[in-house]
Structures are given as structure tokens and as C-alpha cells.
């Protein structure tokens, strides 16, 4: 049955953030909180890469021959056919990339190395107001426990 009184009774799960308002009888008190009866199994997630945007051929005509692409491509290669094929004949995609040896031939300079790294420092959940003042507990220390 939920998390009971939470973090100290008056803060996160007691009378402040989770008392009689947001979490007393719901989020952290007697409701769905983090009780064992409400824990489900794993959440399956399926992801897919974004569609390539560098080369596109869309037509109702017939294309024969080769298409040459030179440069740095973000994907190893994709090909797709959309539309309807006639009831007679064949339709296919033949895709080739070099000699089959795939490797990274160029890497950028700094990438993600240099940049702002505030993370959890002084913002929403760090040492600042966070959940503490107003939304969570009476005084708060940033984590919502109240004091």
C-alpha cells in the first residue's frame, strides 16, 4: 500500500509534498505509490533510427543504372520501396556499398567534450529550491524531504 509516510512524515511523503494533497492518499500515502502490488514487469521499448534525408528518389517512372554517392554519410545504408508494383513484372532494390569493408573514416574534433555540464548541480534538484520550498515540505533542501 504505497510508500506510507515517505521521507520523514512531513516532507516528500508526509504532509508536504505527499501529505493530504499530491501524495497523501495517492502518490506516496495509501495509493499507487511504490508498493509491491503496483510494481509491474519490465516495460518493453522499441526504437528506430530517423529516416535518412540525404538522398531521395520519388517517382512513378522506372530508374535503371547506378547512383553514386560520395562523402561522409551518417548511416551505413538504407533502401526502401513505397507504392504499388504492377501485377506483372518484378521490382527490386540492389544496394552495394564499396567492397563490404565498413569502418569509420573520419571523426570530428571535440564533439560533446566541451560544453556546459551543470547536471544536477544548482538547479531543479540540486541545492536550489527544487521540490523543497512550497511544493515539497516546509523548508526543503532541494530533494523534497522538508525539515
Curated annotation (Swiss-Prot):
Under Pfam families, the record lists: Chorion_1
Which molecular function term from Gene Ontology is one that the record holds? structural constituent of egg chorion
Q: Where are the sequence repeats?
A: 11-15, 16-20, 21-25, 26-30
**Disulphide bond pairs:** none
What GO terms describe the biological role, i.e. biological process, of this protein?
Answer: chorion-containing eggshell formation
Gene Ontology CC terms:
egg chorion
Q: Where is this region: Central domain?
A: 39-107
Record InterPro entries: Chorion
Right arm (Gly-rich tandem repeats): region residues: 108-147
Q: Where is this region: Left arm?
A: 1-38
Domain of life of the organism in this record?
Eukaryota
Q: Which family does it belong to?
A: Belongs to the chorion protein family.
State the protein's purpose: This protein is one of many from the eggshell of the silk moth.
- What is the name of this protein? Chorion class B protein B.L1
UniProt organism field: Bombyx mori (Silk moth)
Organism ancestry = Eukaryota, Metazoa, Ecdysozoa, Arthropoda, Hexapoda
